[in-house]
Amino acid sequence: MNLRPLHDRVIVKRLENETKTASGIVIPENAAEKPDQGEVLAVGPGKKNDKGEVIALNVKVGDRVLFGKYSGQTVKVHGDELLVMKEDDLFAVVEK
């Protein structure tokens, strides 16, 4: 992937939700909710403060993050559906 986000934006690939419940019931795709977790694929350099200094982002490539179901802008790149969002749209990093 050759996308380089600008400023405080990140590129996230949604992680797929389970399509089957613990009891074995298959959830049809049109009834499943959008996943609200993803993996960070790229990060911008950061946001400038009032002094013009760049403040680095708190997330890094490979982080698993939580975000709102309707956060970000969806883009298609080489057949993959990705999200471009500001770091402020992220709720948390999932620690391993």
Swiss-Prot record:
Function: Together with the chaperonin GroEL, plays an essential role in assisting protein folding. The GroEL-GroES system forms a nano-cage that allows encapsulation of the non-native substrate proteins and provides a physical environment optimized to promote and accelerate protein folding. GroES binds to the apical surface of the GroEL ring, thereby capping the opening of the GroEL channel.
Assembly: Heptamer of 7 subunits arranged in a ring. Interacts with the chaperonin GroEL.
Protein name: Co-chaperonin GroES
GO cellular component, one term: cytoplasm
Keyword set, alphabetical order: Chaperone, Cytoplasm
Domain of life: Bacteria
Family listed: Belongs to the GroES chaperonin family.
Listed PANTHER family: 10 KDA HEAT SHOCK PROTEIN, CO-CHAPERONIN GROES
Gene source species: Delftia acidovorans (strain DSM 14801 / SPH-1)
NCBIfam families in UniProt: PRK00364.1-2, PRK00364.1-5, PRK00364.2-2, PRK00364.2-4
Main location: cytoplasm
A Gene Ontology BP annotation from the UniProt entry: chaperone cofactor-dependent protein refolding
InterPro entries per UniProt: Chaperonin_GroES, Chaperonin_GroES_sf, Chaprnonin_Cpn10_CS, GroES-like_sf
GO MF, any single term: unfolded protein binding
Compartments, as annotated in UniProt: Cytoplasm
One Pfam family it belongs to: Cpn10
Gene3D superfamilies in UniProt: GroES chaperonin
